[in-house]
């Protein structure tokens, strides 16, 4: 009986993962109709919950209050989800200015009636100062009861809902003439409240398991191999181009540099001209320096001498087939070379590749974007002065952004950390094989290097936050930066007692920053979309990213432990056995905060989703894979029910395999499946 819940747990996790791939192939409507909304899917969850409840009772879990509250919270959340599924209703309400409405269309296209009347007084789009980037969408509404008595005049906007008599209204869309507004209607009188109660119980239970003196986490902290050192502090964390260059008319360096601090409109925000120039040259040429010229020199010279600069090979085309089709030698094309008289050479090529999703098609799109930027520059539409009345950046803000642009924090760090990481792991393995300890001078030097790397990265990350005016967690590039920072901080807290954590910290942060540098992530600083301007989102992303960083440490622990146990003589080597035991204990210890942070992060994301668009769960691929990760890591705590997890090798291999789910959650969804949470997939 005790193994039935875990059999159902793994079966459910496998079905959830498979459903995301079916959704990617057949569409969201298909997978909802044939999976998420089916009787057998609900029955599977009910069986899982019922079997878990039976085990809780048979084991008298209430004798362990923290664990009981946590598991009870999970069951309460499930009960809330069932109530939402069977008693909740959602739909859309269309309001036109001055026209009263008392009904809406539900998800099944049926007309449902409201016990009151709503009238749209006005709708407006609010923008970031001096830009065309929306900061909010606002509906001013009047609410009257059936007798015509005014109940309220609410302001409904993104992340600001209106509730009346069990109905909640969320800003969803608007009419093009700005005289109509679409509101999402959610009537869930029981499910949401019950689910939120479960959320609270899960948080209380998680905290209780961390603080319970007789709990597994505190017992691990008291283990002789882990007692020394500052481990408890973990709880407080929670070149000039070489191509031949023809003489070019170029603006003098001093003149161009004087333009760097000029404030312009860029990416729908106020920014120094240096930011625009740097991003333009990086985008078009692939590097921030062209033939030894500063970005400001390139942009200013191209604007002043367009005829000459249009014939300069500066537009990088990485795809060999496209270069051959265009008849271009080398990797760089001229803007003039993309035209044959008045004919744009990319147009017929794009018509041939449109809809094929081929590498050539993507290369054509990328080159077209670069050509478009160059044309905007020559036509004088790329550099936009500030509109009258636009608030200007302070001198301190301008200096901060110029400093951020001039110091390549990301590039310096990934190169330095990867180099130090490989050297550190080599020295660590050499000392272990030779059975030599680390001398004090070496330890101090490596510790200093780790702290310097951490402080340098923290300075760059905080500088980016100051420049953007928000917590830098808006896109894939910024979340990768945050993960690297958490990895480095964790390594700093653990390395004194566990020297093998040091190379892990360098390597993990280095590879994370390398992915951010090389991947398809956008490092430009942009304003937040209205729905993203929520503190719930910031906490949701922060906690989940911290959990991912800790899971990465557990994975590397597993790889190192498996490597040590693969040696034939490990059974007879006391030092190796002690190292393996240390790695096992450390992984089990980190499993507590990492899994709890992931779970609480998922819950906060549900609250954010409910506040923003009226649904605390929507079976988006990112949500599904985060839930799968929580289920997979949650199973690892149950060594009594799953005795094979007591064997060190099996435990470490399971942790390595579990991290593949985390990689799928972050990278797989972003680049393969898409969805509302995807940073990279245009779908």
Q: What are these model-derived regions, one by one?
A:
Residues 1-683:
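Solvent-exposed, non-transmembrane regions of integral membrane proteins
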């Amino acid at each position: 009986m005790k193994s039935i819940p875990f059999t159902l747990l793994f079966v459910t996790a496998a079905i959830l993962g498979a459903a995301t791939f079916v959704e990617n192939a057949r569409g969201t409507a298909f997978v909802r109709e044939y999976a998420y909304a089916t009787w057998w899917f609900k029955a599977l969850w009910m069986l899982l919950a019922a079997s878990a409840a039976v085990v809780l009772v048979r084991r008298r879990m209430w004798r362990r209050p923290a664990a009981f509250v946590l598991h009870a919270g999970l069951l309460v959340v499930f009960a809330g989800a069932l109530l939402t599924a069977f008693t909740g209703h959602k739909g859309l309400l269309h309001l036109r200015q001055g026209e009263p409405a008392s009904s809406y269309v539900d998800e099944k296209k049926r007309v449902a009636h409201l016990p009151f009347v709503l009238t749209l007084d006005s709708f407006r789009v609010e923008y970031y100062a001096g830009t065309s980037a929306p900061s909010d969408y606002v509906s001013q509404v009047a609410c009257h009861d059936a007798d015509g008595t005014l109940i309220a005049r609410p302001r409904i906007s993104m992340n600001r809902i209106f509730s009346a008599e069990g109905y909640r209204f969320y800003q969803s869309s608007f009419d093009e003439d700005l005289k109509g507004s679409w509101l999402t209607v959610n009537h869930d009188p029981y499910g949401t409240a019950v689910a939120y109660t479960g959320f609270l119980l899960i948080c209380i239970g998680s905290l209780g398991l961390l603080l319970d003196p007789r709990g597994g986490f505190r017992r691990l902290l008291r283990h002789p191999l882990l007692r020394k050192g500052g481990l408890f502090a973990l709880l407080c964390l929670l070149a000039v181009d070489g191509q031949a260059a023809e003489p070019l008319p170029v603006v003098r360096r001093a003149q161009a540099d004087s333009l760097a601090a000029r404030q312009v409109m860029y990416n729908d925000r106020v920014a120094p001209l240096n930011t625009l120039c740097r991003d333009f040259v990086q985008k078009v040429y692939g590097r921030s320096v062209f033939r030894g010229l500063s970005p400001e020199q390139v942009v200013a010279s191209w604007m002043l001498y367009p005829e000459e600069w249009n014939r300069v090979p500066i537009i990088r085309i990485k795809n060999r087939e496209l270069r051959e089709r265009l008849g271009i030698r080398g990797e760089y094309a001229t803007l003039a070379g993309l035209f044959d008289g008045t004919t744009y050479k990319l147009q017929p090529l794009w018509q041939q590749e449109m809809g094929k999703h081929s590498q050539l098609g993507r290369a054509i799109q990328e080159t077209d974007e670069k050509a478009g930027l160059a044309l905007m520059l020559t036509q004088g539409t790329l550099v936009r002065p500030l509109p009258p009345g636009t608030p200007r950046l302070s001198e301190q803000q301008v200096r901060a952004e110029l400093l951020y642009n001039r110091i390549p924090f990301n590039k310096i760090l990934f190169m330095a950390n990867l180099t130090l990481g490989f050297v550190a792991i080599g020295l660590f393995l050499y000392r272990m094989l030779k059975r030599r300890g680390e001398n004090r001078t070496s330890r101090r030097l490596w510790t200093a290097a780790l702290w310097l790397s951490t402080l340098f990265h923290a300075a760059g990350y905080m500088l980016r936050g100051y420049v953007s005016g928000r917590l830098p967690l808006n896109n894939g590039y910024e979340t990768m930066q945050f993960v690297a920072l958490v990895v480095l901080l964790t390594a700093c807290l653990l390395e004194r007692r566990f020297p093998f954590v040091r190379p892990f910290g360098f390597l993990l942060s280095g590879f994370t920053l390398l992915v951010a540098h090389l991947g398809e992530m956008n490092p430009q600083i942009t304003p937040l979309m209205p729905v993203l301007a929520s503190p719930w989102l910031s906490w949701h992303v922060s906690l989940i990213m911290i959990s991912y960083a800790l899971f990465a440490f557990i994975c590397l622990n597993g790889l190192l432990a498996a490597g040590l146990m693969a040696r034939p003589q490990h059974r007879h080597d006391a030092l190796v056995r002690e190292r393996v035991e240390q790695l096992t204990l450390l992984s089990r210890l980190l499993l507590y905060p990492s899994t709890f942070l992931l779970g609480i992060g998922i819950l906060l994301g549900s609250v954010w989703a409910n506040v923003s668009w009226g649904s605390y769960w929507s079976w988006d691929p990112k949500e599904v894979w985060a839930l799968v990760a929580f289920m997979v890591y949650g199973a690892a705590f149950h060594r009594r029910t799953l005795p094979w997890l007591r064997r060190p090798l099996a435990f470490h291999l399971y942790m390595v395999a579990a991290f593949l789910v985390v990689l799928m959650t972050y990278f797989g969804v972003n680049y393969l499946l898409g969805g509302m949470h995807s940073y990279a997939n245009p779908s």
